[in-house]
């Protein structure tokens, strides 16, 4: 279950961002949601990622934060026929050009795992 390591990385990154805001004198009340960009070839289960994040964030300011993700399809470039487009398979080992069925291809992307942004609630009364 590699979702645990990804969820832990997300939690640590958000907690670091919260700490930075608090060092600037801003009081963080809660983290509402976290938007991610996840490549299809990472084989991450969003349901498992959300479940694990919920468990490990239980005693933090991120408790109850919703993980949202945009799944990113890998791009393919065929060196033989020069086809370029989205790849529909999730198995990197079975990749062939959809136009000429060549295996002489290059993959671009699909392995991303990025935090795009997070919605953080601040105490504005200070």
Swiss-Prot record:
Q: Which residues bind Zn(2+)?
A: 78, 81, 97, 100
Residues holding Ni(2+): 2
One Pfam family linked to the record:
HypA
Briefly state the protein's biological role: Involved in the maturation of [NiFe] hydrogenases. Required for nickel insertion into the metal center of the hydrogenase.
Question: To which protein family does this belong?
Answer: Belongs to the HypA/HybF family.
A GO BP term here is:
protein maturation
Keywords for this entry? Metal-binding, Nickel, Zinc
Superkingdom of origin: Archaea
Molecular function GO terms recorded: nickel cation binding; zinc ion binding
Report the InterPro entries cross-referenced here.
HypA/HybF
Family matches, as Gene3D superfamilies:
3.30.2320.80
Per the UniProt record, the source organism is Methanococcus maripaludis (strain DSM 14266 / JCM 13030 / NBRC 101832 / S2 / LL)
Q: What gene name is given for the protein in this entry?
A: hypA
| Annotated protein name in UniProt | Hydrogenase maturation factor HypA
Mind telling me which residue stretches traverse the membrane in this protein? Answer: none
- NCBIfam families given for it? hypA
